[in-house]
Swiss-Prot record:
GO terms for molecular function: sodium:proton antiporter activity. It comes from the Bacteria. The gene is nhaA. Gene3D superfamilies: Na+/H+ antiporter like domain. Keywords: Antiport, Cell inner membrane, Cell membrane, Ion transport, Membrane, Sodium, Sodium transport, Transmembrane, Transmembrane helix, Transport. Signal peptide: none annotated. GO terms for cellular component: plasma membrane. The lineage of its organism: Bacteria, Pseudomonadati, Pseudomonadota, Alphaproteobacteria, Hyphomicrobiales. This is Na(+)/H(+) antiporter NhaA. The keyword Membrane applies. Na(+)/H(+) antiporter that extrudes sodium in exchange for external protons.
Amino acid sequence: MLDLSSNRLPNRASLITNRAFSAIERFLHIEAMSGVVLLLAAATALILANSQYTSLYEAFWHTPLGFNFGHFNLSWDLHFWVNDVLMTIFFLVAGMEIRREIHEGALASVKQAILPIVAAIGGVCIPAIIYLSFNFNGGHIYGWAVPTATDIAFALGILALLGKAIPSNLHIILLSLAIIDDIMAVLIIAFFYSTNLDPSGLAIAAAGIALVFFFQWISFASAWLYVLPGAIIWWGLMVTGIHPSLAGVILGMMTPVFPTRNLVSPLTTLSNAIQTLQEKNTNTDLHHISTTLKKMRKGQRDIVAPVIRIQKELHPWVAYGVMPIFAFANAGVSFANFDLASQKSFLIVLGIIIGLCIGKPLGILAASYLAVKSGLCRLPPHVTWTGILLIGFLAGIGFTMSIFVSMLAFQDIAQLNSAKIGVLCGSGLSALAGLGYGLIYIKNNKKTHNKP
């Protein structure tokens, strides 16, 4: 916060650095707390789906919603609005987080990025192999990517429950791994779950991307103006046959990582505004004070890079709004329609549970170990192999992202329900394993530190 009683202003580098660190802390806090809201939303959906209100619950999400404009009619059911439209905002925030991490975070240098990248690759490959080993001969092979995803909110939420005894470097590794996991999930969705591609849609998406570049070239600062090119990209991807929510990733990755260029420096604007407020003759001029405060807010806004500022504004809405709504819309699985005696259903559930609970920690630990022993990277300070294993257990909490992938992988309702049950059980077991192992990890660390 700026001190109005002094004419000295912090330098630009200091301000930007403080903003970056506070953004990371805010991100971790919001993700951790939102896990509770997600859990409540999922539990409510499960209760409704297995109660006397199950038909009402299902009918609600199939309610059409749209609008007419002359001869133009746009109408989709609520399920589509949540999964294809609302989730675009989630992917927008994910795209901005990826962009920021590449610019100044854990992915900013090859040396820093090797460990989480290798760990994430192991955490994707081993669960996929485990799932395929159970389901290779069936018609449900397309579910291989379901156990590869990580729900960052739940994972960080469990880590937050373990308290400050967990080294901060473990938080950073988990966050970096989850971000890389998001990148791989986006690539998997784009390349493996996009069918009947129509090239004409790519031209529409390209026009939207070109419009973004044009807006940035003429220095449009308002984020609302980018809704139009974002909608064009979204529509283009849908026409192409690629999941339209990935438009959020494209827009997020294009968000500037440097403050908006102005003719007048933001620091100069703030300095002039502070000087104006300190003048005695303006203390009674409310209009003048109001105008000056607006200039200060503009200077404060412009000093922060759009990728940090917009993410900060959207992140709480995504964490406490978009994701709980998604969980409430998709976690409601009716156990009455689930037949565990069916071999197909059983193998889908088994492949996903083992993939999440065993495949994730095994893949992350094994890949990290090989990378360190081969000399590709080193473990960060205060991070041990037991800590990496803890990260592996928490990364097995797939939940919302795994459910999202399962809805793309399975068209058959029975198979989709089986996949969702596998995700819920696997994520729950991974959460319990992570929490239990985390308590053991903390206890052992205390014993080590107490030794003379």
